Every structure is written in structure tokens, then in C-alpha cells.
Amino acid sequence: EASIDLRWGITPDWLLNATINPDFSTVEADNAQLNINNTFALFNREKRPFFLDNQDYFDSDYNLVYTRNINAPNYGAKLTGRENNHAFGLFITDDQNPNILIPGNRSSSVAFIDGESKAAALRYRYSVNNDITLGWISTLRTAENYSNNVNGIDARFRLSTADVFKFQTLFSTTKYPNDLFKQFCNVDEENEQARCATPENNDDCQF
């Protein structure tokens, strides 16, 4: 199938990326990693050009935008840029073979969900001056019977040439499909009773 990629420098400070049916077959393969006796899911470095371009616009103190979970997009669009003291990043994409990370206090797992998913991320930063930066981030992923939304604000204060104070506060809501809820949020075993809450409508399954 034909693949179309667009990289347009609208201005020296603003960049638009778009892709339809992207071909990632030429992207370097991941390095082998051992997951024996590893209770946490493996993280792989992003190597696909669409997601790599201006990736730092979405950075924060936590790894909130992990694009490797987007396996097989049919399309994607991304806008990044700066205007005076403002920095802005937005991307939207779909995924034909979605997987999600199931977090836990002592472990994490990767689970696959049926159907197509949509993913989006928005990041904004404002530099008050050379010493103070304020930011906001929002991510959204939806599929049939699944949704996850994360919102957060952050700030960075340079106190001196050697000291920096940073903080970030986050709020998230998640709804899991019934099959995943039953698989990862069960209280059948006595030692698992403290692991999961059992909220109404499978919302915010909390590990």
C-alpha cells in the first residue's frame, strides 16, 4: 500500500508532521532485552521518525507520552512550535493493534485490546523568565470499552546556579474492558485483596 509522509516547516519555529499508512519497515529493530524474572514491562526506545521529530516538546518529569504503545497507526498528525515564551505540542493518531500498560505497585504488564484506538497528547509550556517555567500536559487514549485520560501541571524554578526546584501534579481516570478488569482486578485470592479496588463500571481500576 502507498505511504504518504509530510514534514512542513510552516515557519522557522513551527513544524507540521503528517503521515498516512506509514511504513516503518526500514526502522532499526529493537535491541534484545531479557525479561526473565522481570516483573515490570519492558520499555523500548522510540525510533520511528514521525514520533521522534520534536519529541522533546512532550517531555515532562514523568514519562507520560510513551508512543511505543502505538503499534500500527493508519494516520497521524503532529504540530509543534514556539512563539515568544510559549511552547506547544499536539499530536493525534490511531492504532489498529493497540496495547496498553497495566500498572501496579510491584509489577506491570502489557495487555492487548480489540479493535481500533485513538490517541492524542497536548503539551504547553510557558517560560516566565530564564528561571521560571510553567507547564500543562494532557493525554487521551480511547477504544471500545476502554479510555484513559491524564492531566497534569508542572513548574520549574531555578533557585541558583546549582539548585533547581521542580514539581508536577497529575490526575488520571481509566476505564478498562470487562475481560481485562476480570483478569487484572480480581479479589479471588486472599493475597490479592489489597491489590485492586472494585469500582463501579470498571472505572479507575486501582493497583
Model-predicted segments: where are they?
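Repeated loop/turn-to-beta-strand initiation elements of outer-membrane beta-barrel proteins
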Residues: 14-16, 85-90, 130-135, 161-167
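Residues that define the transmembrane beta-barrel architecture of outer-membrane proteins
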Residues: 1-2, 44, 71-75, 82, ...
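Outer-membrane beta-barrel translocator domains and adjoining extracellular loop/strand segments
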Residues: 30-33, 100-107, 145-152, 177-184
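Outer-membrane beta-barrel translocator/channel fold
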Residues: 26-41, 166-207
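Extracellular loop and loop/strand-boundary signature of outer-membrane beta-barrel proteins
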Residues: 63-64, 102-110, 139-141, 200-202
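Transmembrane beta-strands of outer-membrane beta-barrel pores
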Residues: 20-26, 83-85, 92-96, 138-144, ...
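Residue-level signature of outer-membrane beta-barrel architecture
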Residues: 8, 80-83, 125-128, 157-159
